[in-house]
């Protein structure tokens, strides 16, 4: 079920990328190279699942929101891989963007993908102006100096300051955008308030499992096995150990599922969220 659902989400988002970036240029090619690379599209899946809680948006708007969030995610991956950052040559099993297109073009492609996310939301004719403002406020906070960018800076600092809080780093680098995936299709403030802390914990669990897989199975992640070691990178596994990392992630997902089951009344939304959360723990890449 989860593979079919995420494949359907990925197909819709990929088509939106291709249709929106069909004007041929080196920049659009570089943008599509990372955006269309093999991936789980988990964030898009969460957008599609949570959209069913209220069922207030058109299909086009849901696809645009999902694409915007995946665009921000792709931008962050391109910039994270740069020589000045994590200096990774591989991403998703293929050469990183800066290896394929050069460092300068990769930087520009990342910049363009960030702008493209806001362009998608601003240009959506089905979304109300008030909802557009809420979405733009949410995703700009997620990817900005209080979100992913701050998390990346803390991640870089942690190479020389091992006492940095790994949970805070993961919450900023991963949790913030996953929170956006959970709440940007919604309008009800009580539902948003309920889902936000759950979403941030799910983001932490996702990144913990990434840390586990980078330790136990890096090739299946499509990354260089020596990358984190070379960069002296702080991870949940290096700080707490492999066994605690797995146990903590499983407990987070178990608690998240229980909270969702007690609150979410739409069976379709709940079942899809349950399988996505379980997939986070069970995934191998």
Residue ranges and their predicted role:
Residues 18-259, 269-281:
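Mg2+-dependent prenyl diphosphate-binding active-site environment of isoprenoid biosynthetic enzymes
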Residues 265, 282-285:
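Generic C-terminal helix-cap and adjacent flexible tail
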Residues 1-17, 285:
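N-terminal amphipathic/basic leader segments beginning at the initiator methionine
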């Amino acid at each position: 079920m989860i593979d079919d659902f995420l494949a359907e989400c990925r197909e819709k988002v990929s088509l939106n990328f291709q249709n929106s970036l069909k004007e041929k240029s080196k920049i659009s090619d570089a943008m599509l190279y990372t955006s269309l690379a093999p991936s789980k599209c988990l964030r898009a899946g969460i957008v599609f699942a949570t959209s069913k809680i209220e069922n207030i948006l058109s299909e086009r708007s849901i696809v645009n929101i999902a694409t915007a969030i995946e665009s921000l995610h792709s931008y962050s991956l391109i910039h994270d891989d740069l020589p000045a950052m994590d200096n990774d040559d591989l991403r998703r099993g293929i050469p990183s963007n800066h290896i394929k297109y050069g460092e300068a073009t990769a930087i520009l492609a990342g910049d363009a993908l960030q702008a493209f996310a806001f362009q998608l939301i601003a240009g959506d004719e089905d979304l109300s102006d008030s909802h557009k403002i809420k979405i733009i406020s949410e995703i700009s906070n997620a990817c900005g100096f209080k979100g992913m960018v701050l998390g990346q800076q803390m991640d870089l600092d942690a190479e020389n300051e091992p006492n940095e809080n790994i949970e805070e780093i993961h919450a900023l680098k991963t949790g913030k955008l996953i929170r956006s995936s959970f709440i940007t299709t919604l309008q009800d403030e009580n539902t948003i308030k309920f889902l936000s802390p759950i979403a941030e914990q799910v983001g932490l669990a996702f990144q913990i499992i990434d840390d586990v897989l980078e330790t136990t199975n890096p090739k299946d992640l499509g990354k260089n096995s020596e990358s984190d070691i070379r960069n002296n990178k702080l991870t949940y596994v290096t700080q707490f150990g492999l066994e605690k990392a797995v146990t903590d992630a499983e407990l987070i997902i178990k608690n998240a599922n229980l909270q969702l089951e007690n609150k979410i009344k739409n069976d379709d939304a709940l079942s899809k969220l349950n399988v996505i959360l379980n997939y986070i723990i069970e995934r191998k890449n």
